[in-house]
Amino acid sequence: YFAQMVEEGCEYMVMEVSSQGLKMHRVDGIDFDYGMFTNISNDHIGPNEHADFAEYLYWKCQLLKKCRVAIVNRDDEHFEEICRNAGREVVTYSLEQDANFMAKDIHYVSEPDFVGLDFDVTGQYQLNVKVNIPGKFNVYNALAAVVVCSYFDLPKDRICHALEHLYVNGRMEIVHT
């Protein structure tokens, strides 16, 4: 599909790369401009995936070695090890610690036709963001998306509009009764 995307004029793509995909060498030969490490926990441990957490972390970190810029969640408890395994430039984001990009003044918002959160991006980038899906993990996800968007010089109003109108079918849909 990559060749078809190029033929049809696609300049950028976002791709989820799993630890299993890395372990099975599915992305060998691909150098990524940006790689994002959101978090890691004891998922994917078992006979069909990874033998133990150390193996899982090892393979997750392999993605960042393939990236020009590694975007890493500063709040993840394995941050130091992740950064030791990162490739070239490391950019950090956080809700709780000093980082290149930080989410501050986080508020949960409940309005007619909107349930979500509002926060300020501070650090290397200044922006007020409203995201229409609640939950702390969505602050992390939205902040990580802002980090990537900042590298592409996208207009801030487009970033804000996209996050405020984000829609995933079946996720936090408002049902009027």
How does the language model describe each region?
Residues 10-22:
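Switch II (G3) loop of P-loop NTPases
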